[in-house]
Each structure stands twice: as C-alpha cells, then as structure tokens.
Amino acid sequence: MLTKGSKVVNVGIADMQGAQSPEILRTTLGSCIGVVFYAPDKKIGAMAHFMLSKDPSGKDSQKNPFKYAETAIPLLIKKMNEMGCNPGEYSVRLFGGASMFKGVQSSFLQNIGEQNILTARAILEQSKIPLILEDVGGNDGRTISLYLDDGRVLLKKGGFEKYLYKVR
C-alpha cells in the first residue's frame, strides 16, 4: 500500500538503490538474493539484487559490481555511509536464494541459490553487520518491498503475502 507522498523505486537485477522515507524499495527474486539494509532512526535504507556469489573471472565485477555478492554488499555498506548511516545504526535482512532450476542437469544451476545465501551470510558476518531476519531458500520466487517510513518488508511468496516488521 502506498502512503501519501511515497513512490516505488524498483531495484532491477544486478542493481542497487538507496532511498529514504517515504520511498519504497522493491525487487523480485528467484535464485538471486535481495539484501535489505535499514536504519530505523533515520528511516534510510538500501537494497541490492545480486545474481551470483562471486565473479569467476574477476573482471566482470568491475563492470557489473551489483551482479555479485562479493562486490554488491561492500558497496551497499558504502552507500549507507554516504547517506549518513554508520555501522551500528542499521541492520540487514536477506531474501531469495530459491532453487529455481529443478530438473536441469547442472549442479551449478541447481546450487546458485544456496551458494548465494552462504556467501551473503559470510560477507555480512565478516563485516560485523547484524543479520536480523531472512526468508531464503525453498523453491518459490519472491517479491519484496521495503517501506522506509517504518522499515517493514512486504514479502510475497507462493501466492501469499505478509508484512515483516523486525527492524532491530
């Protein structure tokens, strides 16, 4: 539900956006991961939509840094700092990482979601940023919307939707 004066900012594949209240950040995920940063006291947030855990060539991440967890998450941290939020003022929620390629005879494709989840968790732990909530794995894609007025996330998955209110 849009509140007065708010607008939806879509976060595309291999993309990142930062905004403040009353904006809404939204993305749709399959095996990709949506990383949601939110600073409740400042009503500022950022969201990245990355596709893969690491750049196997080490070259593509220079052109497409939000395609990979290893470059997207540090850039999210930098974006939060640029918007005036220091570590300790924000927390993180993680979404996506579904197994979307069942029946495909490729272990790489079958494990993309799982690898994305594990890599994102490891980078967040190394960065000492609290991961307070996640809805990851499974076989269903998701659409997530971060409402920057209060930090709630609307999660749509498997024909159902629910609001997640945990922000600290």
Swiss-Prot record:
GO terms for molecular function: protein-glutamine glutaminase activity. InterPro entries: CheD-like_sf (IPR038592), Chemorcpt_Glu_NH3ase_CheD (IPR005659), Cytotoxic_necrot_fac-like_cat (IPR011324). This is Probable chemoreceptor glutamine deamidase CheD 2. The keyword Isomerase does not apply. Its EC number is 3.5.1.44. Keywords: Chemotaxis, Hydrolase. Belongs to the CheD family. Transmembrane segments: none annotated. It catalyses: L-glutaminyl-[protein] + H2O = L-glutamyl-[protein] + NH4(+). It comes from the Bacteria. The lineage of its organism: Bacteria, Pseudomonadati, Spirochaetota, Spirochaetia, Leptospirales. The keyword Hydrolase applies. CDD domains: CheD. One of its GO terms (biological process) is chemotaxis. Probably deamidates glutamine residues to glutamate on methyl-accepting chemotaxis receptors (MCPs), playing an important role in chemotaxis. PANTHER family: CHEMORECEPTOR GLUTAMINE DEAMIDASE CHED-RELATED.
